[in-house]
A protein has these predicted regions:
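Domain-core detector
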Residues: 1-218, 226-247
Length: 247
């Protein structure tokens, strides 16, 4: 039964997603896309681009996946898996590609000759979104499952890229510094301080970042996570004060 409707749903979602992405690249996301392509982008730019990719994917799925068109008005797991997974894999491809371009060109400018690692298979992260959408019988609940969780997962795709490349560089003897900046807009704008995020704010060694969950984020979190490969002539003497000492 599901096989009869899912191919058309997938086609519609992917078509809408690509349409959204062309608009992102040509309009609101143009400066980000071309800054990356021209080698002028920062990690903050790629993070913002990942956010746009998430919004493009979220919009495409919400436009097409209507419970009125599904058997029994229900988002059965089989349908969720067959429709959500393909577009989110495409989202991962967009983010990972641009992330690699930015890091490679940033390394070149700094004279660093280090290999770039593509982020690991995103199946586990995508499965979490499928879990939230599966079984929904309310359009509002389904749309909610396809909004913040999808956008946050797109950002996590980039977080994973940064984390895995930091781990690689650390294994090669480079000193990696993780910086997390609190988002005072977005989900947190005008609301109470998010203590969960504030606990992870600041500058961390890579080891401490892993221990304290600095690479993690909740749905709707727009905190900026950056990873820097330290210059060999710099040494951080006190991680708790976030102060640098130049040698």
């Amino acid at each position: 039964m599901y096989e009869d409707i899912t191919p058309e749903l997938i086609k519609k979602i992917k078509t809408q997603f690509e349409r959204n992405m062309s608009r992102v690249n040509e309009m609101s996301g143009k400066s980000l896309y071309w800054k990356i392509r021209r080698g002028q982008a920062t990690q903050a730019d790629v993070s913002a681009y990942a956010d746009w990719v998430g919004r493009a994917g979220s919009d495409a799925m919400k436009r097409v996946l209507k419970l009125d068109d599904l058997p029994d008005g229900t988002m059965y797991r089989e349908i969720a898996e067959q429709t959500i997974v393909p577009v989110m894999e495409d989202m991962w491809g967009y983010v990972d590609t641009q992330a690699a371009i930015q890091l490679r060109r940033s390394d070149k400018i700094r004279g660093l000759n280090i290999g770039i690692k593509n982020a690991s298979d995103p199946k586990q992260r995508i499965a979490q979104v499928v879990d939230m959408a599966a079984g929904q019988t309310s359009q509002e609940a389904l749309d909610n499952a396809l909004t913040d969780p999808v956008i946050s997962t797109s950002r996590k795709f980039y977080d994973d890229f940064l984390r895995e490349n930091a781990d690689l560089r650390d294994s090669l003897g480079f000193e990696e510094v993780v910086i997390r900046k609190y988002d005072d807009r977005g989900l947190h704008g005008g609301k109470d301080v998010c203590l969960w995020c504030k606990e992870r704010e600041g500058t961390w060694s890579l080891l401490d970042a892993h221990i304290n969950g600095v690479f993690e984020r909740h749905p709707g979190c727009n905190c900026l996570i950056e990873v820097m490969t330290s210059d060999k002539t710099r040494l951080q003497t006190d991680w708790t004060r976030n102060e640098w000492t130049d040698l």
